[in-house]
Structure formats: structure tokens, C-alpha cells
């Protein structure tokens, strides 16, 4: 019985504690559409900045922009994984300088639950954080 205990202790000592896991990542789904077909400018956050100073120094590094043709039956949908969606989840859609913008709509869902929705003429912003 003594050798079994010694063997178990050796196995524990050799393997050591389990490796530390990274932060829990949340599925964040952005959805944007408009009342009429329109080429929208969409900015979104797809990664957690390491800290606010890095984000503040160059926010566009962490907020890609795409142009997407959206409409009532043609939403733009993207799911990203963020560790801190309460700080960093954000999507905004704008009409740029168009003289005839549609009404934009956005939703932001975290782990399948819609937590923010918004709409507006010329653009819409969905974020958990007040900017």
C-alpha cells in the first residue's frame, strides 16, 4: 500500500496543477439593418483591447469598419467572441453624408440574449457601455 501512495504522490508532483485557462469568452452577435436598401458604414468591436489606454490611443485599431448593403430583408450579422462585452461590445451603423438616409436598426446579443437594441435616422449605436 505504501508504494501505491508514493506512486500517486509522484504522479501528482510530475503533472503539477492544471494550466491556467484564459478568460471566459462570450458570443457577441451584432445585427444591423435598415428600413430601405442602403450601403451602410458599419464599425464594430471584434477584440478586447488590452487596456483603455491602448484603445484610447488608437480606437480604430480595435474597431474595424466595413461597408455593407443592408435593408429590411438583408441584415448584416456578425458573431465575435469577447471576454468583457460589458466594456467592449459595440456596433454602429451610419449613412455617411447621404442626403436621404434610411432609419437604421441594430441589436447586440450576448450569449444568445439580446441586451441592447436601438434605431435612428442617419445611424444607430448599440453598446452596453455609455460612450
Residue map of PLM features:
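A broad, low-specificity signal marking well-ordered, structured residues that form hydrophobic/aromatic
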Residues: 18, 28, 124
Amino acid at each position: 500500500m505504501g508504494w501505491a501512495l508514493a506512486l500517486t504522490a509522484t504522479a501528482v508532483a510530475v503533472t503539477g496543477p492544471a494550466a491556467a485557462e484564459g478568460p471566459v469568452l462570450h458570443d457577441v452577435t451584432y445585427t444591423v439593418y435598415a428600413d430601405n436598401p442602403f450601403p451602410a458604414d458599419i464599425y464594430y468591436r471584434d477584440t478586447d483591447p488590452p487596456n483603455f489606454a491602448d484603445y484610447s490611443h488608437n480606437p480604430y485599431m480595435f474597431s474595424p469598419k466595413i461597408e455593407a448593403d443592408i435593408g429590411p430583408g438583408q441584415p448584416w450579422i456578425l458573431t465575435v467572441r469577447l471576454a468583457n462585452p460589458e466594456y467592449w461590445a459595440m456596433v454602429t451603423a451610419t449613412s455617411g453624408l447621404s442626403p436621404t438616409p434610411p432609419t437604421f436598426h441594430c441589436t447586440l446579443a450576448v450569449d444568445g440574449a439580446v441586451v441592447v437594441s436601438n434605431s435612428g435616422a442617419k445611424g444607430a449605436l448599440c453598446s452596453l457601455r455609455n460612450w
